Amino acid sequence: SRQIGATWYFAFEAFENAVMTGDPQIFLSASKVQAEYFRSYIVNIAEQYFGITLTGNPIRLSNGAELRFLPTNKNTAQSYSGHLYCDEYFWVPNFTKLNEVASAMATHDKWRTTYFSTPSAKTHQAYPFWTGDEWKQGSKKRTAIKFPTFDELRDGGRVCPDGQWRYVITMEDAIAGGFNLANIEKLRNRYNTATFNMLYMCVFVDSKDSVFSFSDLEACGVEVDTWQDHNPDAARPFGDRPVWGGF
């Protein structure tokens, strides 16, 4: 579900592991902005609980641990290795490429890979990876193997036949577990059923119900980092040159 603190939780987990073991931690996010959320959480955790000011990217701890925060469009990302966290992977364009890069970064048995995200569309490249269909592909023996049901994945998570541990946390589950920052009945009343289910009940959108397919929208995307004449931190990002505007 959205807004239940998953990014903060994994930021704390990674920081704790870095402090206790000295292992490198790598954070891959759908965008540079999302990657900065991870970094800001860790900086705030260190300041709030330990009175330590962390700076830089990567963040380097006194025990040698490095914490790197990267958007998925960084082609140099695969040169690093360590425990890997992939945030909002159901919203990452070209997930297949991301998964290849992620696999290379966490090849060694000692490294752990954690994927987590809110759901998007069933046509997203990551959907077969989540359901296990990608693992079953090309093998009659694997095709007959059943994966845990949605309800079973909500019940504390399960280790699945492909070796992955999967866990679904809906807003209902979060509230039952002590989350008290949202009123689920107000949320149900605010949205139509389909929107509520996608945002808070971990239900994927079926593209047949959409005006545009997710793949069509993906094709319209652009990597802003490739714009050599654009400075997002400037008062006038494109200087005094003419630009097209749209919505």
Language model features: what each stretch is:
Residues 5-6, 34-35, 76, 92-93, ...:
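Flexible loop/turn segments at secondary-structure boundaries
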